[in-house]
Every structure is written in structure tokens, then in C-alpha cells.
């Protein structure tokens, strides 16, 4: 305990006792120095000093009512600023207490100047600093619920989630949340887990919410050109795979099928317009010139390593001209490839014929995904012919019918019946069934099933009526083994089952040719089996057995 010497005045003794009480409370952060103002008349002000560092934490209390700046904030000096001030200003080892009013006033002015300097140092110079803006938080750093709110407000577009998030699976999950909220329905039965949606992005589908599993079965193997080929088929129609399998068995047991490609070439037919029919006729004559054709071929072929122009055919309608380009596209189905080449040729033609106006890069004489006689008569994609000789024994034992019944039914149904219906390319029993199933399994463009299913099935009795000769002619099978859906894992695996995954390393187009042959042979197997069931009256029985659920 401290005791005051006897020569101390009462005022000095008061301050010593007061400081002893004050210091613990200030350092314990119980009360601040400014909070003490109401309790005494003079107040304090804080000044930096090296003299009393061990005692008052580098602060000395200066008394006097004039020194207090009430209702003004005390300057806060960061530690690094204190160090800079100590370097810039000489330290004061001792501060004399003012003796008179003049000294007090001069000391007060010095303190005010020091405080102004300190405030200037603390206040940032906004003129020399860039304006701070609120940083936009990246979408991917938000929670799914926060992103959902932004989607509902229209601040984020649903179809851009993959690009915004950089995570295709998360984009699908959030889009499912949005759809369920909009519909007030659960879509849990549509699966989305366990799928690599990065392979879909920018190639196969937009606004993805999941995928639809389709059962995949295999028919065969069928002996095709001396090799056994297994045929993957994706379908929801019961009895289809079983029926095709039976046809494959009948063909293989009879020695197999033979198949050949008679023509190949994807087509694109833009439509252009001229000022009058004279200009249109001059244009067609120019195109038909051999030298001019070779010049256009050079332009077309320069756009791709694989695309090779094989023909140009022009058709006039008034002052409009439809230019049907046909080109080999290797193992790709080739629509994008041929369109790129056509655009280059049109730009070249525009330089020569300045009055030519392009109406559309597709004028519907291609013809893509629509029934048309031009595909039936001139072909598109791969033109394929497949044949087999089925022995009479196999017809009776495997197909449960006879040769003459099959021949008669084929004439009445597939030939006369289709003709009476005005069919174009539909002279068959159910070619599209098999084409679609294989298209789904192997990642083809299913809408091109329209022209790819063009087929005429023919049957003849041979060897004195003992055996059956069957053939299918399909002039427009449009397939590829690279690009589009062929890159998806399941579809790629189905192509691998056939043995045509990817592009051919030895001969461009060989894999797509083999896929077209496989489809034609499977169609022939399906035709053979269905026609046998119809001729024997077994169709309804088989469908009741394989194509109806027990609850129906």
C-alpha cells in the first residue's frame, strides 16, 4: 500500500489516490477515460510519451478543464501509425506541466495541431484511391436454395446454369428443384444420378433434368457377310427383340445374309432466288458445266478432312433454284459437315452471281426427317441391299409357316397394300420398328428414322418352291459412328457390341457402312419373323404372351 509524504498538498494527494483507482479499471476495460468526465471538473486528455511507458501504457494524463474536448471522439492511432510518428518526430523524454496561462494556451494549440495531423493521417485520401464497388458473388459460391431464388426472380437463366456453375450435375439438380416447385410435383422417378452430364452439355440436350432409361436387349447373333454380329436394340415394345432374334436364327441357320452398300452420300439442298427465270436458267447451266463443278468441288472439299463432294443437282421452280449437294462424310452421319461445305460454296457463288439471294440453307429438297420420293428414288446417307436364302426346313421348323404362304402374303400386304395406300418407301411390314430400336441403342438421330426406314421387302419361292429367297432394299439409311449421341457411354458401348465404335482407322466410312449393313440385316430378320407370324396367325398370340403386363 502507498502512503503520501507529509509535505503533499490535499489536491495532489487526491490525484494520486484517484489515479490508483482509475488505472486498474481502464486497463481492465471496465470504463474508458472519457466516461470519467462527469466525475471531476478538469478531465483529461491523452498525449503520447516515452517517459511513463511502464506506468500508464505510454500515456500521461494532463489535467485542466481546457484540455478536455468533450463530445468529440478521441483519436484512434493504429500501432503502425504510432511507429511512423515516432520515426518522424523526436520522442519526448519529459513533458513539463504548464506553469502559467500563456504556456497552457500554447500547449493547447500544439495539442490541437497534433490531433489535426493525426486525423489527416487516419482519414484516407479518396481522391487518390479507386472507388470501391460491391463485388458480385459468383453464382457457384451460393447455395442451391439461394440460386433457386435467383432463378425465380429471373436474375439467373435456367439454361445457363451449366456455364454459370461449371458443374453439370449440380445444374441438373437445381433445375429439378425449380421444376418441382413450378409444377408442385415430384419428379423423383426421372433419374439423374450416375450419369456424366458433361458429355451432354453443348452436344445432345439443353435444360437437362435427368435421363430416361430404356430397356436394351440383343438379337442374334446373325451371320452377316461371313461374320457373326450381335444386334443391340432399345425398345419398350415387348416381343420386338424376341421376334427379331427368331429371324436372325432362321437366317444364320440357313447360311447367313449378304449385304452391300450401293451408294453413299449425305445431302443438303439450299434454295436461292434470282431476279427472273432467265438468270435462274443461266445459273443452272453454269453449275452443270464440268469445269465449274470441279471448281466448286475444290471449295467444298477444302472445308473438311473427310467431306468430299460427289454430285450437285439443280431443280428450278419459277425464279428459285434448289441446289442439292451430295457428299461423302466418312464415319459421321454428316449433316453439320455437309452444311459447312455448302455455306462455303454459296459464298463463292455469291461473288460470281451478285444477284443471287439465299433464302435458306435448307430448301426441303434434301430431304431431312420428312417423307419424300427423292430420298426413295435417289437415296440419302447409305443405300443398302441385303439378301438371304432360307431353307424350307428352317421355314417350317423355326418360323412355323411355309414358303408359299410367305410369298403370297408379301405380295398382298407389302406390295399391293402399300401401293393402294399411296405409300412412299413403305413397302414393308415394320422396318421402322427395328431401325428405331437400333437408332436409340447406338445414339443415332431418331428423327431420321423417317427416311432411314424407307424399305421394300421382296420374297420369292426358289428351288422348285422348296426354299425362300428374301431381300430388303433400303436406299436412305442415315447413320454415323462418331458425333452426336454416339459419344454417350451407353450408346458407345452398344456400338462396340456391333464392332463399329468410333471412326475406322483403316478406311474412313467403313464403320458407318457396317452399321448400315447391320441395320438392314436386322430389318430383314424382323420382316421374316413378323411375316411368318402373320401368315401362321400367331401374331396376336405372341403379343398377348410378350407384350402385355399381367395387370392388363
UniProtKB/Swiss-Prot annotation:
Please list the residue ranges that the record marks as compositionally biased, kind Polar residues. Answer: 123-132
Residues modified by carbohydrate are 288, 375
Reaction equation(s) it catalyzes: (R)-mevalonate + 2 NADP(+) + CoA = (3S)-3-hydroxy-3-methylglutaryl-CoA + 2 NADPH + 2 H(+)
Q: Name one Pfam family in it.
A: HMG-CoA_red
The biased composition feature labelled Low complexity covers 79-99, 112-122
Asked if the record carries the keyword Glycoprotein, the reply is yes
- Active site at which residues? 237 (charge relay system), 369 (charge relay system), 445 (charge relay system), 543 (proton donor)
**What pairs make up the disulfide bonds?**
none
Q: In which pathway does it act?
A: Metabolic intermediate biosynthesis; (R)-mevalonate biosynthesis; (R)-mevalonate from acetyl-CoA: step 3/3
As recorded in UniProt, its EC number(s) are 1.1.1.34
Could you tell me the keywords of this UniProt record?
Answer: Cholesterol biosynthesis, Cholesterol metabolism, Endoplasmic reticulum, Glycoprotein, Lipid biosynthesis, Lipid metabolism, Membrane, NADP, Oxidoreductase, Steroid biosynthesis, Steroid metabolism, Sterol biosynthesis, Sterol metabolism
GO terms for biological process, alphabetical: cholesterol biosynthetic process; coenzyme A metabolic process; isoprenoid biosynthetic process; sterol biosynthetic process
Q: Name one GO cellular component term.
A: peroxisomal membrane
Q: Where in the cell is it found?
A: Endoplasmic reticulum membrane
List, in alphabetical order, the Gene Ontology terms for molecular function in this entry: hydroxymethylglutaryl-CoA reductase (NADPH) activity
Predominant cellular place of this UniProt entry's protein: endoplasmic reticulum
Location of the region described as Disordered in the Swiss-Prot/TrEMBL record? 79-138
What family name appears in the similarity comment?
Belongs to the HMG-CoA reductase family.
Quote the PANTHER family the UniProt record gives: 3-HYDROXY-3-METHYLGLUTARYL-COENZYME A REDUCTASE, 3-HYDROXY-3-METHYLGLUTARYL-COENZYME A REDUCTASE 1
In Swiss-Prot or TrEMBL terms, this protein is called: 3-hydroxy-3-methylglutaryl-coenzyme A reductase 1
